[in-house]
Swiss-Prot record:
Function: DNA repair enzyme that is part of the base excision repair (BER) pathway; protects from oxidative damage by removing the major product of DNA oxidation, 8-oxoguanine (GO), from single- and double-stranded DNA substrates.
Protein name: N-glycosylase/DNA lyase
Annotated GO biological process: base-excision repair
Covalent S-S links between cysteines: none
Lineage: Archaea, Methanobacteriati, Methanobacteriota, Methanomada group, Methanopyri
Biological source species: Methanopyrus kandleri (strain AV19 / DSM 6324 / JCM 9639 / NBRC 100938)
Source organism superkingdom: Archaea
Free-text comment on this protein's domains from its UniProt entry: Contains two alpha-helical subdomains, with the 8-oxoguanine binding site located in a cleft at their interface. Contains a helix-hairpin-helix (HhH) structural motif and a Gly/Pro-rich sequence followed by a conserved Asp (HhH-GPD motif).
Amino acid sequence: MTVPTFLRKVTLREICVIEEYVDVQYRAIEALMDTLPSTDLVRLTVANALVSYQLSSSGEDWWREFSSYFRERRPRDIVREYARFLPRSRGNRRLIRQKLRRLHRAKAFLEELSWQDAKSYYRDMNRLRLDLARVLNADPESKTIVFTVKMFGYALRAITGRFRPYPFEIPIPVDARIERITRRITNDDPQLYWDSIARRTGIPPLHLDSILWVGTSRDPEVKRLLAKVLPKLIGELEMLGN
């Protein structure tokens, strides 16, 4: 299996820089650090990630809206305030009842999540994946479960200033963009394909997701920042995303 050319030109450290300086999701979480206590920021990040599917806006605009809303508030009850925000949002208006039910199922987990728990999960993010899947009665490899672990990792990295690579056993979250990119390369199952590429490049799947997500974004701000941070990949990534 051939490794895509652009992945031969990028290191995990460079992807980490892209995540922190280009990815709207990371920057949206980071922007809440001055507003919310650390534990509340982690809880809120997990809550938002768990219902970030079937969006009615781009993913970039959705995370901007989420961050903007909570920068203006200091909620005492994170889950209750999030349940108020979601139905009124612009970027996440589909399947609201289903998403509120999911939030309700996660309510006890979120409310009981302490800062010590969060630090422990950061040392073993695969355990977080399995616990979330159990709480929600979901497939541990499903898109929203693995995506939530990724966003949790972003929150802990932003808060602690410490980078921990994602575990190799956590697969890439397969959304429409990843599905489309994969089909331009191979007919293999996307998670199996990117797992194989991860092993060959030494870059965990959730970090591969970052370069694919950011690199094929049509968001003007993302494209501008990526051109500034890692110009050597712009051409190849744009071809992959078109």
